[in-house]
From Swiss-Prot:
The 70 kDa chitinase is probably the precursor protein of the 30 and 20.5 kDa chitinases. Signal peptide: none annotated. Its EC number is 3.2.1.14. GO terms for molecular function: endochitinase activity. It comes from Streptomyces olivaceoviridis (Streptomyces corchorusii). Belongs to the glycosyl hydrolase 18 family. Chitinase class II subfamily. Residues 53-74 are annotated as: N-terminus of 20.5 kDa chitinase. Residues 1-27 are annotated as: N-terminus of 70 kDa chitinase. It is an enzyme of class 3 (hydrolase). Gene3D superfamilies: Carbohydrate-binding module superfamily 5/12. The lineage of its organism: Bacteria, Bacillati, Actinomycetota, Actinomycetes, Kitasatosporales. This is Chitinases 70, 30, and 20.5 kDa.
Length: 74
């Protein structure tokens, strides 16, 4: 069993497009998850813009987008 949660929230909505934020939180006492994958499926024709360090990078045109990483709570 893991002690982590993943939540998604829409942070901005302009009608024809929106901005969202994933939050992945380790809820266990002083433990780490060295490998995880979070993903979301999108409808056909959707265009997803990948954001890194606060700026918009290249558009990503695919239906499934995943992010890998490490979560710690120590």
């Amino acid at each position: 069993x893991t002690s982590a949660t993943a939540t998604y929230a829409k942070t901005q909505d302009w009608g024809s497009c929106f901005e969202g934020k994933w939050t992945i939180k380790n809820t266990a006492a002083c433990s780490s998850y060295p490998s995880w994958v979070a993903g979301r499926s999108y409808a056909a024709g959707d265009i997803v813009y990948y954001t890194d360090x606060g700026y918009t990078d290249l558009p990503v045109s695919r239906q499934k987008m995943c992010q890998n990483g490490m979560v710690t709570n120590c």
